[in-house]
Curated annotation (Swiss-Prot):
Family label: Belongs to the universal ribosomal protein uL22 family.
Protein name: Large ribosomal subunit protein uL22
GO biological process, one term: translation
Keywords: Ribonucleoprotein, Ribosomal protein, RNA-binding, rRNA-binding
InterPro entries (alphabetical): Ribosomal_uL22, Ribosomal_uL22_bac/chlpt-type, Ribosomal_uL22_bac/org-type, Ribosomal_uL22_CS, Ribosomal_uL22_sf
First and last residue of the signal peptide: none
Gene: rplV
Domain of life: Bacteria
Subunit and partners: Part of the 50S ribosomal subunit.
GO molecular function, one term: rRNA binding
Length: 110
């Protein structure tokens, strides 16, 4: 049985988040949670919570055995970019880009 979890508009760069997501794609849930728990990246803690949410969704759906769950697919898509300006010397300004991401996790039983 399939279980999904989505997180949208999270203030993380999609490029940096994909590095974390690539470490856990296709792994068993417990193994993925251990990898994410001990990763120093900011994205790791957010993906950890999202995988935990997907496991809770699977339990709510009535999956027989949570230990058999694995990450079938996990993807990071680009969200809207927040644009800000920072004042600089001599009346100039530079643009600051604050990227956002949409993360989707799909779990399935082996």
């Amino acid at each position: 049985m399939e279980a999904k979890a989505k997180l949208r508009y999270v203030r993380l760069s999609p490029r940096k988040t994909r590095l974390v997501v690539d470490m856990v794609r296709g792994k068993k849930v417990q193994e993925a949670l251990n990898i994410l728990r001990f990763s120093p990246q900011k994205a790791a803690s957010i993906v950890y919570q999202l995988v935990g949410s997907a496991v809770a969704n699977a339990e709510q759906k009535g999956v027989a055995d949570v230990d058999r769950l694995f990450i079938e697919s996990i993807s990071v898509d680009q969200g809207p970019v927040l644009k800000r300006f920072m004042p600089r010397a001599q009346g100039r300004a530079t643009r600051i880009r604050k990227p956002t991401s949409h993360i989707t996790v799909v779990l399935n039983e082996k």
